[in-house]
Amino acid sequence: MARGAENSKDIATSKIGAKAVRVEVIETMPSFEGLEQDWNAVYDADPDAQLFLSFKWLAGWLKWVSGPWFVLAARASDVAEAPYVAFLPMRISVKTSDIPFHNELNMAGNFAADYTGILCRPGFEHQAIPAFARHLKQMNWARLNLENIRMSETRYRLLMAHFPKANFAISQVSLVGKVDGIDNALCPFATLPPDWNAYLDGLSANTRQKIRRLLKQFEASDEYRITVATPETIDRDLDTLLRFWEIKWTPRKGNLVPAMIRSNRGMLTRSFKSDLLYLPTLWRGDRPLAALATLIDRRKRSFLFYMTGRDETFDGPPPGVILHAHSIRYAIENGFTEYDFLRGNETYKYSFGVKERSIRHTVIGTKNGRNIGGRLDSRTVPAALKEATELHKVGKLPQAERGYRQILEVDPQNADAIHRLGQLLTATGNHAAARKQFKTLTTIRPEVFKAWLCLAQSCEALGQHLEAARAYRQVVKLQPNVPDGFNGLGRMLHKLNRIEEFDAAMELVLEDERQVTERNGRAPDRRKVAAAPASVLSH
């Protein structure tokens, strides 16, 4: 595997018998955007493909997410120009709840996608999926979250066969809500016929009559109306939807709600701009009663109900039933063949003539809880540094030190990690170890005065006055107006019993500068103090 290959692609070849597939790693948006035509071809051919694996949806999502992501892309053979046959989009993060730090892999669509999975052209599952699994096992991670996985049993078994329980800790996460008992592993969906009346005929008599009565009542009324979001109204309509949603869910979800609203607003806004959102709002006069956001998969001819919000104080005909019926009829009239209610077996969904599909959340972990290979993934170094720094700030020094050292195992020249580790060691009184870090830092950032100042202070704490003086001299040379450098240099010269030389040099500099000041008003330049008495620190 060649890290940093052209177009941010790592390349590996995975052989199965006489066959081989070529696995590339895509890590940048330009490289990902270059896959659009190939991605759509695989997507259209894959019967398991769904909107949250579509190129349009993922492109919008990946531009927004924080932290590193990557796509494993499999070609049909080890020939560089062979067509792509499979894709696995993922994200990687660093976790600091345990020591040592470790990495986790998540499906790229988490935490906005109701479904995740693998795209694969039929006939290539037995080549591509094992190749992806082998590639994953070569990476550095301690936990692989296969959350909201929607894939055939055959594909799932092909993947899991490479993570045997003898070598990995495998667990299944329950998707049943602890408060409401809703099973989010069950996903109801309605298959849509080409005719609205044919759809209604497939419902129970009570539901059929109810929908017909409600739609007729609303369409004949001047009091009620339904609008559909346009570029001019999308912000208003999203405000309506999310305001109603916030009122309902804040009591249950509490402090999580603001972040969820930001995430949903961002995802739905991007989806609208990409022509992936249908958002009708039900009104009574000028009063909005409810809004319903449905994602549109035009390639697979599917509507996916994502979220709704309604005015809980409205005591009238059920807005949710009306908006679902309206959306289903619109979908049928426009040639869509499926209305997916996504996750959750809420009772009301089953009145719309649905069947069920299921998803799962499988967690694959290492037996010892540590990363495969014993190292952090280099892509997560910035996040690891941020977390280690936060631990440092709140006084969790052993955890922070371990984090800094793990970073340096992967990136030995990381100046920020070296600097902060040195500061931590200084705070704990380990000046010898701190000196070593700061000495390294001066070779990496010789032009930065703080590196020399830290080195000087460590040397001074160790009683290494000559080396401290040399470092302080560099501080004065680089940043003459920093008092710590000038004062430290004077202190060390005093310790070395060379204060007379320092005074003499200082007097020469000040006399020279007094003359300059009289001519043009400039202040004395302390930089000359560092430069003038070079012989003072020569032995």
Label each region the model flagged:
Residues 2-21, 91, 159-197, 338-386, ...:
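Active-site/acyl-donor-binding loops of N-acyltransferases
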Residues 381, 415-416, 431, 449-450, ...:
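Helix-start (N-cap) detector for alpha-helical repeat units in TPR-like alpha-solenoids
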Residues 393, 427-428, 461-462, 495:
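Register position in tetratricopeptide repeats
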Residues 22-105, 148-315:
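A conserved beta-strand-loop-helix scaffold within acyl/acetyltransferase catalytic domains
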